[in-house]
């Protein structure tokens, strides 16, 4: 599941939706806007190609790791300090595969940010 939205997300709701009898681990990551010198927040452009890029990241993770499901939610627009930016959740029968997949997904998304993230000064 890949979603780009303006509104916030619920980590608990996403994780609850990933539970199933064969799943033994659900790993979640929530990225937030951190303070930076003179910063008011970050602006993420709502780009059409972003959805496709995130879907490709999801697809690669499913193919590479022994996982059951992936959820990626990325917010767009202006996000102030401490606001949620990104949710990545991965479910698997074993924790190692879930941790490894989650880390891989986060690293790939971080590379995407270089093209559609802009710092906003106070």
Task: Give each language-model segment a name.
Residues 1-84, 92-122:
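N-terminal, polar/charged subdomain of small-to-medium soluble alpha/beta proteins
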Residues 88:
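Phosphate/diphosphate ligand-binding glycine-rich loop within oxidoreductases
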């Amino acid at each position: 599941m890949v979603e780009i939205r303006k509104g916030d997300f619920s980590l608990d709701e996403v994780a609850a939706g990933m539970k199933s009898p064969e799943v033994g681990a659900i790993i979640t990551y929530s990225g937030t806007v951190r303070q930076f010198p003179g910063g008011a927040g970050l602006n993420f452009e709502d780009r059409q190609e972003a959805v496709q890029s995130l879907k490709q990241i999801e697809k690669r993770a499913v193919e590479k790791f022994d996982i059951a499901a992936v959820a990626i939610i990325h917010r767009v627009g202006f996000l102030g300090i401490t606001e949620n930016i990104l949710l990545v959740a991965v479910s698997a029968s074993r924790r190692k595969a879930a941790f490894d997949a989650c880390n891989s997904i986060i690293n790939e998304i971080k590379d995407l940010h270089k093209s559609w993230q802009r710092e906003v000064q106070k």
